Amino acid sequence: MSERHLPDDQSSTIDPYLITSVRQTLAEQSAALQNLSKQLDSGQYQRVLNLIMNCKGHVILSGMGKSGHVGRKISATLASTGTPSFFIHPAEAFHGDLGMITPYDLLILISASGETDEILKLVPSLKNFGNRIIAITNNGNSTLAKNADAVLELHMANETCPNNLAPTTSTTLTMAIGDALAIAMIHQRKFMPNDFARYHPGGSLGRRLLTRVADVMQHDVPAVQLDASFKTVIQRITSGCQGMVMVEDAEGGLAGIITDGDLRRFMEKEGSLTSATAAQMMTREPLTLPEDTMIIEAEEKMQKHRVSTLLVTNKANKVTGLVRIFD
């Protein structure tokens, strides 16, 4: 097998026009979005939002080709933000998957031209089922638009593609419309971060919102007694690898903590640490977290007080562990 040589990016010569083309494409798509915002029919959008709010089934997206890819994304966004939704391929629907659709479902059909054959073939069956239809199209006079209960027009002059063929601007506008509908429904449903986390338990946000500090805390808390020497404190902080040490009273309860910062501040104030005890260096009544505190609340508290480690306590106010902001 011959060795494959990758081109050296530094030695490649790029026609400056290509960079100009990139800027022009971004500018044209940005202008198209601005134009859509200015020309949108508020009455049609209000009707669409009412249809979505009152839908007792699923909001089903369908589209062919690139429109289908965008439809999948819109459906995924709706589903993850509290609006039950799925995507159905129009060709597959016409060959049996119509059985997935109930009369309670709302259909959003995507076709820039409004004349996509596979989409139009679905319309008679959907009307026979009694489904409401929303069209996203660039042609308000198209067959699809005329058969829809509500029409969201793209108001697009041309595709960004120099040949005006590849779906570019139309897919950007359609995606933006989908996001706009999803965000509007988030406001309508008062969809909060906790709700979002329920649908994203495997993601970072879901973990932070659904996980308690007790689930992730470290149980081995480095500790010293009130009369511990400076040397002992340093040894426990170093061996504990937490940048802090808990100071225990005679009954084993929490008397305070000593952090790296406490040591520096004490040294700046006193000048010498050789004869200091833990009781002299510690911060009394340190911040703590109950075991049932959610991770996101712990992070907020740490950021507010500019600390990276907090001790965790149980209902009896006994220290049971510690949690770091990056755990």
UniProtKB/Swiss-Prot annotation:
Species of origin: Escherichia coli O6:H1 (strain CFT073 / ATCC 700928 / UPEC)
EC number(s) given by UniProt: 5.3.1.13
Name the record gives this protein: Arabinose 5-phosphate isomerase KpsF
Reactions it catalyzes: D-arabinose 5-phosphate = D-ribulose 5-phosphate
BP GO terms, sorted: lipopolysaccharide biosynthetic process
Feature type site, description Catalytically relevant: K66, E118, E159, H200
InterPro entries xrefs: CBS_dom, CBS_dom_sf, GutQ/KpsF_isomerases, KdsD/KpsF-type, SIS_dom, SIS_dom_sf, SIS_Kpsf
Broad class of enzyme this protein falls into: isomerase
TM region positions: none
Its job: Involved in the biosynthesis of K-antigen capsules. Catalyzes the reversible aldol-ketol isomerization between D-ribulose 5-phosphate (Ru5P) and D-arabinose 5-phosphate (A5P).
Gene3D superfamilies: CBS-domain (3.10.580.10), Glucose-6-phosphate isomerase like protein, domain 1 (3.40.50.10490)
Domain SIS: 48-191
pH dependence, record text: Optimum pH is 7.8.
Entry binding sites for Zn(2+): H89
Family: Belongs to the SIS family. GutQ/KpsF subfamily.
Positions annotated to bind substrate: 82-83, 89, 95, 121-130, 155-157
Record entry for activity regulation: Inhibited by 10 uM zinc, cadmium or mercury ions.
Residue stretches making up the CBS domain: 217-273, 282-327
Stored PANTHER family: ARABINOSE 5-PHOSPHATE ISOMERASE KDSD, PTHR42745
One example GO MF annotation: arabinose-5-phosphate isomerase activity
The entry's keywords: ATP-binding, CBS domain, Isomerase, Lipopolysaccharide biosynthesis, Metal-binding, Nucleotide-binding, Repeat, Zinc
